[in-house]
Design a protein with these regions (language model features):
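A short beta-loop-alpha structural element at the N-terminal edge
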Residues: 1-22
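Conserved acetyl-CoA-binding loop of GNAT-fold acetyltransferases
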Residues: 130-140
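A short helix-loop-beta-strand connector motif used in the catalytic cores of GNAT acetyltransferases and
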Residues: 46-58
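Conserved GNAT acetyl-CoA-binding A-motif
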Residues: 111-121
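Conserved GNAT-fold acetyl-CoA-binding loop/helix
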Residues: 14, 22-45
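Conserved beta-strand in the GNAT
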Residues: 58, 64-73, 84, 89
Length: 145
């Protein structure tokens, strides 16, 4: 099993973007966003759309994606985190085997600056983030339009 890191310099192909988008959608459980939203976050990370870019981390075994994380850079520091971890998912058959922990450790080492995550308060993956040093600092309130 190896972790591959994609950013603006190690480009994602259109096929990679589709494959990773599908994986995240299929394995995000009950807390998933739309396919379109997931694809947009990957396109932003890959700098295929205007923005600061970010990172996509995937763990694979013989070409099969076992887990993936998407991080978007915010360009902010001191007052908000420089990075936001947008998506994390592990294939159902591999949950509980340390895949998410390894991916998250790699992500933390790779990303410069603070990392934030918006997560549903009922999502059990919160415990993984707490073990890695994440703290609940704020609540998000959103006016949806």
């Amino acid at each position: 099993m190896n972790i591959t890191t994609f950013d603006a310099f190690s480009r994602l192909s259109i096929n990679d973007i589709s494959r990773i988008s599908k994986f995240l959608y299929d394995h995000s459980g009950e807390f998933k966003d739309s396919k379109s939203a997931i694809r947009k976050s990957i396109m932003y990370a890959a700098k295929e759309v205007p923005g600061l870019g970010g990172y996509v981390f995937i763990m694979e075994n013989k070409g099969e994606i076992l887990g993936a994380i998407v991080v978007n850079r915010t360009g902010m520091n001191e007052y908000l985190a420089e990075n936001i971890l947008v998506y994390v998912a592990v294939k159902d058959a591999y949950r509980g085997k340390g895949i998410a922990q390894k991916l998250l450790s790699h992500t933390i080492k790779y990303c410069k600056g603070d990392i934030a995550i918006h997560i549903n308060k009922d999502n059990p993956v919160i415990e993984l983030f707490k073990k890695q040093g994440f703290k609940s600092r704020n609540i998000e309130m959103r006016l949806e339009r």
